[in-house]
Swiss-Prot record:
The keyword Transferase does not apply. InterPro entries: Ribosomal_uS19, Ribosomal_uS19_bac-type, Ribosomal_uS19_CS, Ribosomal_uS19_SF. The lineage of its organism: Bacteria, Bacillati, Mycoplasmatota, Mollicutes, Acholeplasmatales. Protein S19 forms a complex with S13 that binds strongly to the 16S ribosomal RNA. This is Small ribosomal subunit protein uS19. GO terms for biological process: ribosomal small subunit assembly; translation. PROSITE patterns: RIBOSOMAL_S19. One of its GO terms (molecular function) is rRNA binding. Keywords: Ribonucleoprotein, Ribosomal protein, RNA-binding, rRNA-binding. Belongs to the universal ribosomal protein uS19 family.
Length: 92
């Protein structure tokens, strides 16, 4: 179910504070966050945000096309190793 329009988009306040602080100081360090649920705002464009995927922080460079999406969409939590290869000797 989508978020109600009357509520508006959500972003973690600490993440907004970190982005505003770096924008003010013209600094482009990687911002670490655990907030996968935060919506990407236009103020985030040009920053690299390291999003936690459960094991490590995945660096995500924010572009204009990402605005409106969630940070967690760009840091996959599951790794697909491929389907098992079928053994041709056993199959008849």
């Amino acid at each position: 179910m989508a978020r109600s329009l009357k509520k508006g988009p959500f972003a973690d306040q600490s993440l907004l504070d970190k982005v505003a602080k770096q924008a003010k100081s013209n600094d482009k360090k990687v911002i670490q966050t655990w907030s996968r649920r935060s919506t990407i705002f236009p103020e985030f464009i040009g920053f690299t945000i390291a999003v936690y995927n459960g094991r490590e922080h995945v660096p995500v460079y924010v572009t204009e096309d990402m605005v409106g999406h969630k940070l967690g969409e760009f840091a996959p939590t599951r790794t697909f190793r491929g389907h098992k290869k079928e053994d041709k000797k056993v199959k008849r």
